[in-house]
């Protein structure tokens, strides 16, 4: 594991940290991606999935934030040998730092996501609760490349390189 990385402000002030769980399948690997909940992503699939992640406060330990977010979003406590995947910049300017680790979900796994409130429908004055994530699925590397937010594809490339090293 590399030295502790701390959050700093990106150009738009948003920095996130996340974890990419993978499992080996013969000569390939599968990765766990999550689908954002709420009405804006309800009918979106390809390009909408993401690694489990969350925003870090300035100066916060990024790997610790990534672990906290993973546990909050998926209800899974974890530990592992972390593979640093570096960072990417998403379309909106957010910087995302990521680490990968090998793991799996138990048969009895049931998604337990945090909830958020949103005025829905817009300008209705009604607040409705939605899950932060509504699905968590293991995808083959090939399918993950189509499902994941395009800006996060380099994380898959870096994981592939680390596993082939």
Identify the residue ranges that each predicted region occupies.
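Charged phosphate-binding loop/patch that engages nucleotide di/tri-phosphates or the phosphate backbone
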Residues: 137, 141-165
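Short, charged/polar surface micro-motifs in flexible loops or helix N-caps
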Residues: 25-28, 38-41, 57-58, 92-93, ...
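The catalytic Nudix box helix
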Residues: 50-85, 140
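N-terminal strand-loop-strand
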Residues: 2-51, 99
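Short, solvent-exposed loop/turn elements at beta->coil junctions and helix N-caps
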Residues: 6-7, 84-90
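Non-DNA-binding regulatory cores of transcription-related proteins
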Residues: 128-134
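Active-site-adjacent beta-strand/loop module that shapes the phosphate/pyrophosphate-binding cleft
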Residues: 87-125, 137, 159
């Amino acid at each position: 594991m590399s030295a502790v990385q701390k959050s700093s402000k990106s150009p738009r002030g948003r920095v996130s940290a996340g974890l990419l769980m993978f499992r080996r399948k013969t000569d390939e690997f599968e990765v766990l991606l999550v689908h954002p909940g709420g009405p804006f992503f309800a009918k979106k699939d390809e390009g909408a999935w993401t690694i489990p992640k969350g925003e870090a406060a300035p100066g916060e330990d990024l790997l610790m934030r990534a672990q906290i977010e993973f546990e909050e979003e998926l209800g899974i406590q974890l530990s592992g040998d972390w593979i640093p995947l570096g960072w990417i910049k998403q379309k909106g300017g957010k910087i995302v730092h990521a680490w990968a680790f090998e793991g799996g979900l138990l048969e009895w796994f049931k998604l337990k996501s945090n909830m958020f409130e949103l005025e829905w429908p817009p300008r209705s004055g009604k607040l409705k609760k939605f899950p932060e994530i509504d699905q968590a699925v293991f995808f083959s590397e090939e399918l993950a490349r189509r499902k994941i937010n395009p800006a996060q594809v380099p994380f898959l490339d870096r994981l592939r390189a680390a596993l082939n090293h």
